[in-house]
Regions:
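Beta-strand elements of repeat-based all-beta scaffolds
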Residues: 1-176
Length: 176
């Protein structure tokens, strides 16, 4: 793919393996040498294992899977995410059918060095696997609650509830 304007010409190059999996993304500006933006590696099952980002390739994202091949974790230097299926998380019920029972993500707060903010949703389903509610929670590293801006995080609530009509269409959606 290429795009150009009066001053700049950008050429993106994509490299794939024989199984049509994306191996790398490069960018060349104004006919210069291409710089690698991302490089992917895969495990023996074809799952994305690592994604190295940036020209220095220092920003690495790691992907982990459960025995069924479902994404379980995404880990990077500034962000991590974990999906819960068959495990209890808070009040959520284990889901053995592929539904996600909870998701938790952690990120570094950019305003305060080394402060980790943890946020999560617990999901609840009805008898035919329709999402009934998503309960939000958040927390920060102990001792950081008094930091500017972080106390407000604990006061936010992004929880949702859903209801459906007899045809399975969403009839109401309530956000807090």
């Amino acid at each position: 793919h290429s795009s150009s304007d009066a001053k700049n010409v950008y050429v993106y190059s994509y490299t794939y393996d024989n199984m049509e999996r994306l191996l790398s993304v490069s960018l060349a500006k104004d006919g210069g040498n291409p710089a690698t933006l991302a490089r992917n590696t895969y495990d023996e099952f074809g799952h994305l294992q690592n994604c190295r980002l940036g020209q220095s390739m220092e920003g690495i994202m790691q992907f982990r899977y459960n025995i069924r091949g479902w994404t379980k974790q995404i880990i990077s230097p500034h962000f991590s995410q974990e999906l819960y299926y068959e495990c209890n998380f808070g009040n959520s019920e284990p889901c053995y059918n592929g539904n996600i029972s909870a998701i938790e993500w952690k990120s570094k707060d950019t305003t305060i060095a080394s402060t980790i903010v943890s946020q999560a949703y617990e999901f609840f389903y009805d008898g035919i696997n329709r999402l009934e509610s998503a309960d939000y929670s958040s927390s920060v590293v102990p001792g950081a609650e008094t930091a500017v801006g972080l106390t407000l995080l604990n006061e936010r609530d992004y929880s949702c509830t859903y209801s459906y009509d007899l045809n399975g269409n969403i009839s109401s959606l309530h956000r807090k």
